[in-house]
């Protein structure tokens, strides 16, 4: 039976720093934002059973917490595996996905379904993606599940000039989501 004396309504919104501290998040040096890996499957998929391009065995799946603040963004990148983003709390996030076929789409990841937000978003393997907090937002807490599991060997950071040449109709968002280099 549930002990409702232990369940309290939220009295005030946490700050980003409180979330970082409570969830023991660390800066995501290569991408931006803050994260902590929370799960790495014990099951390992041999490289011989994986699609072309994987250099070694991979865990079946991995999961992280991921936090964005007004000072951070997720730099445009791609990974070799499918990613599934889950929205947990906070303000919505604007995500840009750039597909290998040249198409692009912007998705709002959040919990305001009436406004068209999506609480769960799939980023297919090989699709460039980056995201930022909506203007005026304080923070967004999400999760990201990757299968086959994430490995930095499968991570590629996007180069602004190459992305602008290929996806010129999204130049403003590409410029905002790529490091100044």
Features from the language model and the residues they span:
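N-terminal amphipathic/basic-hydrophobic helices that include classical n-h-c signal peptides
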Residues: 1-11
